[in-house]
């Protein structure tokens, strides 16, 4: 199974990806996480340091693939999760999609690409071009990390559009949304009501998730000494269980930009209207209510 994790820049994709990878490993799967970001920091919380990138290694070998060995590019991280960083072209030059393609090509040359039960691609920020949508060419499922805010859901909607485009020629589906570090989910629920897709999990707004990234440790590793964090790991184990059940997934139809803007802004600008809609759905007339608290 191959997974591609997308979401708005800074939403917490790498932290989420690392913990999902460990959760899958805890379920007995052999897992490879591939960081697809020029910052090459996707696997930092698994390995504890910035590992050399595929591009750096290929450059040092003058792009002689036959001179590259698995141990040159694959590093084992916490929980037995193997880690690879694709890296990227210099700032302002080159194409990130090319780098992803070179990474997959090299792993195939090393007979490593098909040795894993699960390969997880952790992809940088919003989908801004076809190049950064390249991991979708290899994925069975796309996981979209969001929060309960407009910007993250706007980015999620653009990612949905990319999935729909790729699904024309690839057996690709959206596995679902993961809400990251949010106490509320009203906008998430509003979005999936209009653009139906599963919500795999909504992670609580706790500092331990943010701090784990700064520490360079996953929540599973922190939980070994801080048992109070253990309950958060259960969220990721639940995500892993859903993914391993090989869900049908969906190919949603994205909303138009203005339609999405109106949908989400109207939710707060016209709360009474939304309450009336909810009352009608439940079979109640708004006038029959004794009072309404907004």
Swiss-Prot record:
Query: For binding [4Fe-4S] cluster, which residues are annotated in this chain's numbering?
Result: 95, 129
Q: Could you tell me which pathway this protein works in?
A: Porphyrin-containing compound metabolism; chlorophyll biosynthesis (light-independent)
Q: Does the keyword Oxidoreductase apply?
A: yes
Q: Give the Gene3D superfamilies listed for this entry.
A: P-loop containing nucleotide triphosphate hydrolases
- Coiled coil (residue ranges): none
Q: Where does ATP bind?
A: 10-15, 39, 180-181
Q: Which GO terms describe its molecular function?
A: 4 iron, 4 sulfur cluster binding; ATP binding; metal ion binding; oxidoreductase activity, acting on iron-sulfur proteins as donors; oxidoreductase activity, acting on the CH-CH group of donors, iron-sulfur protein as acceptor
Q: Which GO terms describe its biological process?
A: light-independent chlorophyll biosynthetic process; photosynthesis, dark reaction
Its subunit composition reads:
Homodimer. Protochlorophyllide reductase is composed of three subunits; ChlL, ChlN and ChlB.
Q: Give the family this protein belongs to, as stated in its UniProt record.
A: Belongs to the NifH/BchL/ChlL family.
| Name of the protein in its database record | Light-independent protochlorophyllide reductase iron-sulfur ATP-binding protein
């Amino acid at each position: 199974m191959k997974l591609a994790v997308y979401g708005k820049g800074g939403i917490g994709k790498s932290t989420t990806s690392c913990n999902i990878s460990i959760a899958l490993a805890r379920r007995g799967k052999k897992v490879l996480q591939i960081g697809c970001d020029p910052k090459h920091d996707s696997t930092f919380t698994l390995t504890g340091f910035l590992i050399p990138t595929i591009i750096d290694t290929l450059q040092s070998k003058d792009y002689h693939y036959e001179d590259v060995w698995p141990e040159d590019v694959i590093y084992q991280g916490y929980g037995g999760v193997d880690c690879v960083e694709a890296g990227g072209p210099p700032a302002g030059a080159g194409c990130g999609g090319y780098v992803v393609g070179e990474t997959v090509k090299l792993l195939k040359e090393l007979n490593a690409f098909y040795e894993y039960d699960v390969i997880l691609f952790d992809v940088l920020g919003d989908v801004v071009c076809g190049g950064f949508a390249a991991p979708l060419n290899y994925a069975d499922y796309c996981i979209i990390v969001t929060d309960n805010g407009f910007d993250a859901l706007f980015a999620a909607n653009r990612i949905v559009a990319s999935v729909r485009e790729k699904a024309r020629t690839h057996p690709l589906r959206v596995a679902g949304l993961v809400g990251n570090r949010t106490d509320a989910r009203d906008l998430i629920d509003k979005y999936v009501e209009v653009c139906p897709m599963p919500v795999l999990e909504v992670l609580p707004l706790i500092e331990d998730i943010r701090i784990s990234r700064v520490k360079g440790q996953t929540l599973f590793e922190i939980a070994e000494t801080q048992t109070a964090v253990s309950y958060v790991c259960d969220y990721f184990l639940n995500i892993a269980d859903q993914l391993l059940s090989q869900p049908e997934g969906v190919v949603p139809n994205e909303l138009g930009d203005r339609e999405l803007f109106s949908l989400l802004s109207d939710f707060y600008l016209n709360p009474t209207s939304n309450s009336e809609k909810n009352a009608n759905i439940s079979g109640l007339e708004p006038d029959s209510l004794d009072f309404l608290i907004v």
